[in-house]
């Protein structure tokens, strides 16, 4: 039986600095919308899934409103903004259209991510260093609207430094290379990628002790524990693997199982 203390969600009124050593769990429900859009019908509901995730102990809900609207739709964003009881984390590209939507909806978090129309999923981190001036202005506009801003980046010193220079509230470290190495059975590469992530957290905290450090992409119950054990990780955002688990055990149990894997 899972310890109840491990599955209680963190609401907006609770300490946003997460003073416990255990990272929070943000659940991405994009692929509930993927299933819906496959038929172009009104079900299943990403909102209903998100509410069940919160009930089961998710500390936040992540959705990615892509420019091509391949899964999450505008209506989903507005619905969730009015009904979630934890934090909404809206992933989006740094475009004028998305800025307008975010400033209307005012999610608790916006996470800026790169987008390519041909990609199946986000393939890498945002090049903050290469577009520092424009992103600094974009981040400041979101923050002026009362929105906290995270930047999805690869675990590289130059990108972390640029994120700090942008005055971002958080970074989310891309764990895709770590996850892919594990799937390929490349143990040595897994260890290398894990060290990169650990060093990135150290660098981030050295440059700005108040910067929150999240992580995500490709995390599963099999590989999440090593990431969750890294000192300084604030939150893990997990979607595809958790929704896949939900097909067999239900979404509430999938959330509980993921938290158990994180904190075992």
Swiss-Prot record:
Comp. bias intervals (Polar residues): 1-21
Molecular function as annotated in GO: pyridoxine 5'-phosphate synthase activity
Region described as Disordered: spans on this chain: 1-22
Residues forming the catalytic site: 64 (proton acceptor), 91 (proton acceptor), 217 (proton donor)
Binding site for 1-deoxy-D-xylulose 5-phosphate: 30-31, 66, 71, 121
Origin superkingdom: Bacteria
Record-listed 3-amino-2-oxopropyl phosphate binding positions: 28, 39, 218, 239-240
Reactions catalysed according to its record: 3-amino-2-oxopropyl phosphate + 1-deoxy-D-xylulose 5-phosphate = pyridoxine 5'-phosphate + phosphate + 2 H2O + H(+)
SUPFAM superfamilies xrefs: Pyridoxine 5'-phosphate synthase
Gene3D superfamilies: Aldolase class I (3.20.20.70)
Disulfide bonds: none
UniProt name for this protein: Pyridoxine 5'-phosphate synthase
Cell location: Cytoplasm
Role description: Catalyzes the complicated ring closure reaction between the two acyclic compounds 1-deoxy-D-xylulose-5-phosphate (DXP) and 3-amino-2-oxopropyl phosphate (1-amino-acetone-3-phosphate or AAP) to form pyridoxine 5'-phosphate (PNP) and inorganic phosphate.
UniProt-listed Enzyme Commission number(s): 2.6.99.2
Annotated source species: Psychrobacter cryohalolentis (strain ATCC BAA-1226 / DSM 17306 / VKM B-2378 / K5)
Keywords assigned by UniProt, alphabetized: Cytoplasm, Pyridoxine biosynthesis, Transferase
């Amino acid at each position: 039986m899972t310890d109840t203390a491990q599955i209680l969600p963190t609401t907006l009124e609770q300490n946003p600095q997460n003073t416990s050593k255990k990272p929070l769990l943000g659940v991405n429900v994009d692929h509930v919308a993927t299933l819906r859009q496959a038929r172009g019908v009104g079900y299943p509901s990403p909102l209903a899934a998100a509410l069940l995730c919160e009930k089961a102990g998710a500390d936040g809900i992540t959705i990615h409103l892509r420019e091509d609207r391949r899964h999450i739709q505008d209506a989903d964003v507005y619905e969730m903004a009015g009904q979630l009881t934890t934090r909404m984390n809206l992933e989006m590209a740094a475009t004028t259209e998305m800025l307008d939507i975010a400033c209307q909806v005012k999610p608790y978090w916006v996470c800026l991510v790169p987008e390519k129309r041909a990609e199946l999923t986000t393939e890498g981190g945002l090049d903050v260093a290469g577009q520092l001036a424009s992103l600094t202005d974009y981040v400041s506009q979101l923050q002026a609207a009362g929105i906290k801003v995270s930047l999805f980046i690869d675990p590289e010193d130059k990108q972390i430094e640029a994120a700090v220079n942008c005055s971002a509230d958080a970074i989310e470290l891309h764990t895709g290379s770590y996850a892919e190495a594990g799937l390929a059975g490349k143990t040595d590469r897994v260890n290398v990628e894990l060290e990169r992530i650990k060093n990135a957290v150290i660098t981030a905290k050295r440059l700005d002790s108040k910067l929150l450090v999240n992580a995500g992409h490709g995390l599963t119950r099999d590989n999440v524990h090593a990431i969750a054990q890294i000192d300084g990780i604030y939150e893990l955002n997990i979607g595809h693997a958790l929704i896949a688990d939900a097909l067999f055990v239900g979404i509430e149990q999938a959330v509980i199982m993921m938290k158990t894997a994180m904190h075992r």
